[in-house]
């Protein structure tokens, strides 16, 4: 088994495997992912019989950790073609990626697995459960609250609002920036979703997700 990090021009070659393994993802979302995320991520792959048969993606994030900034990678899109499973490809990819991140001085990495048990043998442990706030068109809102669909022009204000909220409540979180929300708006739109902004007296008081029903009921986490 040979594992290697793909060159920028090779990353698109993993799209076929992604579409095959993550068939529940819409075409528009996959197109978004391969247009946007491949700009700055890393992809490790195993090639056999002339094709990529397994892969692991490292998507970069800037985290706030006890008041300090840390550049870390989010492990995602770990996949092996069905006919090539149980050959140790996933373990090999994880070990290679973890060793490389350690060598680069990265303090830690994180992922949001479909099943916790898959990653326990690699010393991953649950540190938190993700809670998302969803928009309900039938909910009663406080008098004076105005709800609008988020657009790129709102991204800077959204980032400032969420940074203030997260700083007060969490020791570890993904840093919010204008670019973060511009990308997130585009990401939700790719799957038919919208971010809703709640404002009172001209100031943001909340941000919620308006998404398809299956996403609300426990679909894939956003990346």
Question: What would you call each of these model-derived segments?
Answer:
Residues 103-107, 113-131:
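Conserved active-site alpha-helix within GNAT-family acetyltransferase domains
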Residues 129-223:
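Amide-forming acyltransferase catalytic core, primarily the GNAT-like/NAT-type
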Residues 21-64, 171-194:
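Active-site rim helix/loop that mediates acceptor-substrate recognition in acyltransferases
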Residues 77-80, 86-99:
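Conserved acetyl-CoA-binding loop-helix of GNAT-fold acetyltransferases
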Residues 75-85, 114, 214-223:
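A short, internal acetyl-CoA/4′-phosphopantetheine-binding micro-motif in the GNAT/acyltransferase core
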Residues 45, 51-61, 74-79, 197, ...:
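Conserved beta-strand in the GNAT
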Residues 1-3:
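Extreme N-terminal starter segment of soluble prokaryotic enzymes
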Residues 43, 72, 107-109, 195:
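Beta-sheet entry/capping signal
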